[in-house]
Each structure stands twice: as C-alpha cells, then as structure tokens.
Amino acid sequence: MSSKIYFNTRRFSPSKWLLGLGTRLHHTLAPAHAKRTASKLLLTPQRNQRDGTAPAGLVKQAVHTSEGTLMSYRLGQGPVWLLMHGWSGSAGQFYPLMSHIAAQGFTAIAYDHPAHGHSAGHTGHLPRFVRAFDELVEKMTAEYGPLQGVIAHSMGGAVTLSSRRRELDALPLLLISPVLDYVPQLYGMVARSGYSIRLFDAVVKEIEQEYQHPLSTVDPLGRLAGRSGLAIIVHDEEDRFAPHGDSLRATQDGRTRLVSTRGLGHGRILASAPAFAAFDQLSAARRAN
C-alpha cells in the first residue's frame, strides 16, 4: 500500500527502527506536541494544483462548507453526477471522464477535497472528507435537484461509502480503483512504516471525538453490500495502491459488478474506455428506471 491512498509518509526516516523509537519517545515525553507533530506529518496530503488542460465550458465555483471553502468544477447540462477524487488527488484527474459525461447529456460536477487541489485547508482525513462531502451533496441537491449518481476514485470510495446521507445508497455508484478495506489497511500501513501505533491511535481518537465518527463504524465493503442502487467497480488487476482482491470480495454480494483491467494502473484507468463504458451502463440503467 502507499501514502498515495491514505496519508503522507514521504518525510519518514528510512530506518523503521529509529522512526519507531523516536516517535514512541516523543509521545512519552511530550504527548501533546507529539500528537500535533503526527497530525501535521501524517495528515498533510501532497497538494496537486496542476489541473491539466481544462475542457471547454468548464465552470469553476467555490462552495463554502464547515470544512472550509471547496473548489468545484462543473461541465455540461442536464442531470448531475458528482465525482470525488482520492488522497493527494484532484478534480482535474476527472477531466476526460467529465467530458464523456457531458457529451452524454449530463452535468458532471467534481470537487477538490479539503487540503487538496484549490480547496482550503492544510490537513485531511476521512471524517473531514465525509463531512465536507455530505454538505456538498446537500448544496448540490438544493441547487440542481436530486443527484443522478456518484463516481469515486481510490480513497474517495471509502468516503462515499462512509457518508451519513443514506439516500445515496439508492443511487448508481461507479467506483474506480476503490479502497474498500480501509481501516485494516490504514493501520497495517502505519505499522509497516515503523511509526508508533500508539501515537497514531491517539491522533485517530482525537479526530473521532471531534467529528463523532468512530473508525469502528467505517466499513466500505459492508456498506456496499447493503446498497440498493446499482454499483460497478472498474479496477486494474495490477493496481499497486488499492488491492484488486478487495473488489473481487465486493462482488460476493451478488449485485456489485466488477470490470477488471490490466495495464491501466491506479490513475490512468480514470481516462480509460472501461471507465467510460461503466458510466454508460449506469446512466442507461438509471434512465430505464
């Protein structure tokens, strides 16, 4: 697994032993300072503000939420599909898919998570992303009417499947390279890095208390299995960041469909024909209903 999915580890010492010793001592001797340092280190994404070539007609709009001002990107006319990127990503990754959606007679709206792209903020984590997403859904629904569906990439899948807005469970959902076994993989990655699990757990507990969102309730696979809306996963078998095996597990619910690819990796798949075709299937099914 990679920091590309969950949090920033680029500044970690190459020595796991020294890192573990240092963070444990820091937490013992100065717990408050250690937690602040850990929060800044672990929860600061790699901000990507390179949008690439914006499609003609793209409208940028700031949206104010309790988690700061988020930058949204709108393209097309018609019923709205909402798109969400993953950790250290940006809405610009969706430009090719947004163009395809707009060409099919829909409005595509993507946005930058807090502390990502052109949105405000310096740190991010799943409960913050969920709160911002839920508020954005409320605002988009009030302005444009009911959403037609949701598209999420990478950690965005875990965010979508942790939303407090249960009405989304009835909507079509396109998951691209999703992170589905979020909490075990998150803690496993911290352990493999050598960072103090006790210190990381202290940071997590503060976030849980602030947002009233215990990680014990985060279960993307379980939430996916309980949805009534059609869900399609597009996932590369050689994805180095999000396990393809978890997407295979997701199909055991008998309703979730999986489109497996090879050679598209974790990011290129966003602009691929299989992703476009999966959207076409979902939108056609939505129209038929």
Name what the model sees in each region.
Residues S3-A62:
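An N-terminal hydrophobic leader/cap segment in hydrolases
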Residues A91, M98-A120:
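Conserved alpha/beta-hydrolase
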Residues T123-E143, Q148:
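Alpha/beta-hydrolase active-site loop
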Residues I151-T160:
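Gly/Ala-rich beta-loop-alpha elbow adjacent to hydrolase catalytic centers
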Residues R165-Y211:
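Hydrolase active-site cap/lid region
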Residues L224-R227, I232-H235, D239:
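Short beta-strand/loop motif that positions the catalytic acidic residue
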Residues R240-D246:
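Conserved alpha/beta-hydrolase "acid-adjacent" motif
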Residues L264-P274:
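Catalytic histidine-centered segment of alpha/beta-hydrolase-like enzymes
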